[in-house]
A protein has these predicted regions:
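Extended catalytic cores of very large enzyme megasubunits
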Residues: 1-574
């Protein structure tokens, strides 16, 4: 026996569907019902179907369910069943409206899935259709219509209905899937291995992946992919991955799905494994795709690519020389190019008004160099994905501290501002002890180059009691020029900046260096952008510059001592 569906298609009659509908009507009123009652009602509906061979439409069958419920006195259940049918009708209308307005019938399954997974009234497709209609314009392209539909779901997100963000993510994933299908057809790829071969030939994928794995291993790994895990994302997370981390063509079209990205990262990370390598690929893929762990930005962005710089955090010591300062800025540009964040210690750079080669008062101070760092962070933006990120550290006793503490504030001389970097201050214990004793005490600021020239040592190279002894020695040395401020005024500047900009960050150098297990081999001047790294630091130094003749051409060979250029990776797991 067959019945006619709403779309005119015929399908075999299934009495279990009728039973489920009746059970739901009782569940909606909180009333229990026996299997015998259910069977009686189902049999009555079935008898009608058998007797009326000319009208076996699904709507007519549902009418008979209503009649049967009311004949047996189940009026509340019949009422809820009628309401349920009306809501389903409204959802179908909304679904059809969205399909017609987007002009894409392939979105039907996605919309049905949303309706099934988010059945509550606040996530009704009717609301989505109404919001979408407010954005819809007839002249929109199909992709613009999808974007408007996604925007509609995003704008429906509220504190009372937060799951609209997950609905928006599903719609965004549908849009992404359509684009990926178009790109795959254009490239003529039918399998994951063919896609990797194509991307490698285009210079978008690291050749080392195909060199490390056989085609059979690649295809076996491809079977690990679980598209259902795309549903774990909310809109914000998926949108970020699509915009920043998926591989794109040179015309900026995505050519990699989120799950393919995770599998590519897993293939990269598992390359060194000698035993059961594909099992490790699967473990890494599962951890990533289930959102149980996330990698640092450079790993997400660069693993599997030709330039596979995976580290996230770097620290450089900026030396007090023109060559050294520009070398540090160049290093930051290269780190930023491949997704790393940077911490830069400027405590060795001479203060404004300092001497240069004996010429008095000509030094411009650290602010002008920090402005260059700021502009580098903005300019080197990882192919437009995001601008660079850098924290600049200065000692609380540095002469340029007051100007430094106003780098990001909105008042004052705009030529002394750098709004796109993150200032941080290095404090000794002495500063906090004096602040606790009496905020009105004087604190003295010095030029590090002047201390080195007159005293013969670098004050920033010490910590703890030795630093305090040398600091007081500098305070009492009349040959050194000093800038005096009350501790209260310094704290006021710090708090004003913190309230207005969220900076400066704090680095308590004495505490860190006392805990440093390698303090016999160097000193930790500062931390990185995230302020979680503490490793010995030293500046890169030029050893020699030599002019040679090679193959008849003059070449300049520069030898440098690398110093301690700090690097660290960061991964975050979910408890």
């Amino acid at each position: 026996m067959e019945i006619t569906k709403r779309n005119g298609m015929a399908e075999p009659y299934n009495k279990e569907k009728v039973a489920i509908a009746i059970r739901k009507s009782f569940a909606s009123t909180g009333q229990s019902v026996t299997d015998e009652t259910i069977l009686t009602l189902v049999n009555e509906v079935e008898n009608f179907i058998l007797s009326d061979t000319g009208n076996r439409h699904v709507e007519r069958i549902q009418d008979e369910v209503e009649r049967s419920l009311m004949e047996h006195g189940f009026y509340a259940e019949a009422k809820n069943y009628i309401l349920y049918r009306w809501q389903r009708t409204e959802r179908r209308k909304a679904l059809n409206h969205i399909v017609n307005e987007t002009g894409d019938e392939t979105i039907t399954d996605t919309l049905k899935g949303i309706g099934q997974d988010f059945p509550r009234n606040e996530y009704s497709l009717t609301l989505l259709a109404e919001k979408f209609s407010s954005f819809y314009k007839p002249e929109m392209t199909p992709d613009e219509r999808l974007t408007a539909l996604i925007k509609a779901a995003v704008e429906l997100t509220t504190q009372e209905a937060p799951d609209w963000e997950f609905i928006a993510a599903r719609l965004l994933n549908f849009q992404l899937s359509k684009k990926l299908t178009e790109q795959a057809e254009f490239a003529g790829v039918l399998s994951f291995y063919e896609k990797l071969r194509y991307l490698t030939d285009e210079g978008l994928y690291g050749s080392y992946i195909l060199a490390s794995y056989s085609p059979e291993e690649i295809e076996e790994a491809a079977r690990f992919i679980c598209p259902e895990r795309d549903k774990l994302f909310n809109y914000s997370g998926l949108d970020l991955l699509v915009k920043r981390y998926l591989i794109r063509t040179r015309s900026h079209e995505p050519i990699e799905s989120v799950q393919e990205m995770y599998l590519g990262i897993a293939l990269h990370l598992a390359m060194p494994e000698r035993h059961n390598r594909l099992q490790w690929v699967r473990k890494f893929y599962d951890l990533l795709s289930k959102l149980e762990v996330t990698m640092a930005t450079p790993t997400l962005a660069n693993a599997r690519k030709p330039y596979h710089q995976l580290s996230s955090c770097f620290i450089d010591t900026v030396p007090d020389s023109l060559e050294g300062i520009y070398r540090s800025i160049d290093n930051f540009a290269m780190v930023s190019k491949f997704g790393g964040g940077m911490g830069m210690y400027f405590g060795k750079v001479r203060a404004a008004g300092g001497n240069i080669r004996g010429f008095k008062g000509v030094a411009g101070g650290v602010i002008r160099w920090m402005k260059l760092v700021n502009d580098t962070a903005v300019a080197v933006d990882q192919l437009g994905m995001r601008q660079g990120a850098v924290a600049v550290y200065l000692d609380v006793w540095h002469k340029d501290l007051p100007e430094f503490l106003q780098l990001r504030t909105n008042n004052g001389d705009d030529r002394m501002k750098a709004h796109d970097i993150f200032p941080a201050v290095c404090y000794p214990d002495l500063f906090w002890r004096m602040a606790k004793e009496d905020l009105n005490q004087s604190w003295y600021l010095f030029c590090p180059n002047e201390i080195m020239t007159i005293k013969g040592y670098c004050l920033e190279d010490y910590y703890g009691e030795e630093w305090e002894k040398r600091y007081l020695d500098c305070v009492n040395d009349s040959r050194l020029s000093k800038r005096s401020m009350s501790i209260k005024d310094i704290v006021r500047l710090v708090l004003r900046s913190a309230v207005e900009t969220g900076t400066p960050f704090t680095f308590n150098r004495d505490i860190v260096n006392r805990a440093n297990p390698n303090n016999h081999r160097g000193i930790i001047y500062c931390s990185n952008l995230c302020t979680e790294i503490a490793q010995n630091m030293s500046a890169i130094e030029t050893v020699s510059t030599e002019i040679r003749t090679e193959d008849g051409d003059m070449v300049v060979v520069k030898t440098v001592r690398p110093g301690d250029f700090v690097v660290c990776n960061l991964e975050i797991g979910r408890a």
